[in-house]
């Protein structure tokens, strides 16, 4: 029960007072109203909260102490809060802007392409799972002003990652290994951290006479403190997904545990069978989801295994480079065992002479190949020019022997030219005056020209067959000469008589001979070379069957060893048709 005190014995007062200087700096900027006569100093300090007190008790001292204590506590708390916020900003930069790393490259760019790339690459395994900009800040703190590039291999479900650092200079890599191999696990607060490097870095640097290694330096406490503050800030860490990849299927399975089949879907099902069918439906769908979940888990596990294998191969690659170093003659002392055993007994002069001999053999082989190509080209060109020269040498004789024919040809050309001019003018006139008659004349002339063309073609074929028949007779005569066992020469009368044999040679035999030549050229060369067929015909026309070796030599430039087979087959064929 609350007792109500009479107003005569109580009064209301503020629990504390505000000083007249409160917000005075702000009030100084405010101009007084032009119609106001009240000064700013005379404005009373009023507190909105009032509490009742007895009039008989003096509470002024208590109010003054309370006001002073509140003012002092407010100022000290404000200073303490400012100091705390400043310290937190220094130690835990929560509002720090995430900048893109300047030295980060894709992992493919760090694949070693030379011995220098292999030696200058350092791998920090089990590096904390921090963001890229945090990794670069940590590495910057460790390497100071040394130039480098870095990348990392990271998997979604892994808590750590592997950081690859390639220094611009090999001595910087050696300095990093010597300085941080043993202390880096303590700096990064992870005992599983390993610094992996190429084991041949010391051997290669020792071979360099002008190399001066950087002395092993001690780790600065400021560096350790800075790295520790980066690792303490949770915002610098990646958010690792704890999802297994099958949560959606698990949710569906949980749904099917409470799944109810709509009765409207089972109208056609007898009542006594509905319960069993509903169970079968739920069991079937659950089984399908379980199979799908198992398959997805297997796929995820397989992907993890592949990622582990890729990491193992990357780590093993540094060890495999040791074998590659042994194959590099510029930077290694040891050679493969088979080469060492072969040239171990040779002196320096003998080994140098051996290298010169090998180089000379290569040059000789190259010279022989080029020379063979040049000779083949020269042979073809010589045959072409020889044939052309013979035609030119025989030009005057041919012109004298056939001068009457050429004179008649010139006369015919002149007469045909004049007649053509007259014919053209008459045809033009006929074209415009009587077009139907013009068409008849044109068709008549066209038929006559076609008949003449057909006749010329038949004459050319007959002439060609006649020439081939003469060639065939010559070949037959040469064969009969070679088959004789005695050295008796063939009488001149027989030769003269044989020259009259073209009339008795059948045309189809000559055609068979030419077909056989074309067939053999296509068989051994792969294509029908008209030039090669012409060379064979020219040899047979000029030497009959007495220049077999010469024909082989000419064909060897193109067919090599197959030239002998082609000539033998041709000679055998001639012997069969010449009987």
UniProtKB/Swiss-Prot annotation:
GO cellular component: cytoplasm; spliceosomal complex
Region (Disordered): 76-101, 484-505
Coiled coil stretches, renumbered: 292-380
Keywords: Coiled coil, Cytoplasm, mRNA processing, mRNA splicing, Nucleus, Ribonucleoprotein, RNA-binding, Spliceosome
UniProt biased composition (Basic and acidic residues): 76-87
Any one biological process term the GO annotation gives: mRNA processing
One Pfam family cited in the UniProt record for this chain: PWI
Database matches in InterPro entries: PWI_dom
Chain segments annotated as transmembrane: none
A GO molecular function held by the record: RNA binding
Biased composition (Acidic residues): 88-99
Compartmental location: Cytoplasm; Nucleus
Family membership noted in the UniProt record: Belongs to the SNU71 family.
Function, in words: Component of the U1 snRNP particle, which recognizes and binds the 5'-splice site of pre-mRNA. Together with other non-snRNP factors, U1 snRNP forms the spliceosomal commitment complex, that targets pre-mRNA to the splicing pathway.
Subunit text: Component of the U1 snRNP particle, a subcomplex of the spliceosome.
Protein name, per record: U1 small nuclear ribonucleoprotein component SNU71
Record gene name: SNU71
């Amino acid at each position: 029960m609350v007792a109500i005190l009479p107003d005569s014995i109580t009064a209301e007062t503020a629990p504390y007072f505000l000083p007249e200087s409160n917000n005075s700096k702000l009030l100084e900027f405010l101009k007084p109203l032009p119609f106001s006569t009240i000064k700013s100093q005379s404005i009373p300090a009023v507190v909105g909260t009032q509490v009742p007190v007895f009039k008989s008790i003096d509470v002024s001292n208590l109010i003054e102490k309370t006001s002073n204590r509140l003012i002092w506590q407010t100022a000290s708390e404000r200073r303490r809060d400012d100091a705390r916020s400043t310290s937190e900003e220094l130690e835990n930069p929560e509002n720090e802007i995430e900048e893109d790393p300047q030295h980060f490259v894709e992992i493919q760019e760090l694949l070693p392409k030379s011995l220098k790339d292999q030696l200058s690459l350092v791998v920090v395994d089990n590096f904390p799972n921090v963001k890229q900009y945090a990794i670069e800040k940590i590495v910057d703190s460790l390497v100071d002003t040394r130039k480098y590039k870095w990348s990392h291999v990271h998997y979604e479900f892994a808590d750590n990652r592997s950081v690859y650092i390639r220094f611009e200079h090999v001595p910087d890599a050696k300095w990093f290994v010597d300085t941080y191999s043993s202390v880096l696990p303590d700096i990064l607060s992870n005992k599983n951290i390993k610094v992996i490097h190429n084991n041949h870095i010391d051997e290669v640097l020792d071979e360099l006479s002008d190399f001066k290694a950087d002395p092993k330096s001690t780790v600065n406490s400021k560096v350790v403190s800075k790295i520790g503050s980066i690792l303490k800030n949770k915002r610098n860490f990646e958010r690792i997904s704890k999802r297994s990849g099958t949560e959606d299927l698990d949710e569906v399975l949980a749904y099917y545990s409470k799944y109810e089949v709509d009765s409207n879907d089972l109208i056609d099902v007898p009542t006594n069978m509905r319960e069993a069918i509903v169970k079968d439906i739920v069991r079937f769908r659950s089984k399908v989801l379980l199979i799908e979940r198992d398959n997805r888990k297997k796929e995820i596990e397989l992907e993890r295994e592949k990622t582990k294998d890729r990491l193992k191969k990357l780590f093993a690659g540094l060890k495999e480079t040791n074998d590659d170093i042994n194959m590099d003659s510029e930077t290694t002392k040891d050679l493969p065992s088979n080469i060492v055993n072969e040239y171990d007994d040779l002196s320096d002069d003998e080994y140098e002479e051996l290298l010169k001999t090998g180089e000379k053999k290569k040059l000789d082989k190259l010279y022989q190949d080029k020379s063979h190509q040049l000779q083949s080209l020269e042979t073809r060109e010589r045959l072409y020019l020889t044939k052309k020269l013979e035609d030119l040498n025989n030009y005057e004789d041919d012109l004298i022997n056939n001068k009457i024919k050429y004179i008649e040809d010139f006369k015919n050309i002149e007469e045909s030219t004049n007649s053509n001019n007259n014919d053209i003018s008459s045809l033009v006139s006929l074209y415009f005056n009587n077009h139907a008659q013009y068409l008849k004349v044109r068709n008549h002339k066209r038929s006559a020209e076609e008949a003449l063309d057909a006749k010329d073609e038949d004459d050319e074929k007959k002439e060609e067959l006649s020439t081939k028949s003469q060639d065939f007779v010559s070949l037959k005569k040469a064969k009969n000469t070679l088959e004789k066992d005695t050295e008796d020469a063939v009488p001149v009368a027989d030769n003269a008589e044989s020259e009259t044999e073209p009339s008795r040679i059948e045309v189809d035999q000559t055609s068979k001979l030419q077909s056989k030549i074309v067939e053999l050229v296509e068989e051994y060369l792969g294509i029908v070379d008209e030039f090669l067929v012409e060379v064979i015909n020219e040899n047979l026309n000029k030497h009959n069957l007495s220049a077999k070796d010469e024909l082989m030599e000419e064909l060897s430039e193109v067919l090599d060893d197959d030239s002998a087979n082609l000539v033998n087959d041709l000679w055998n064929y001639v012997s069969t048709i010449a009987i």
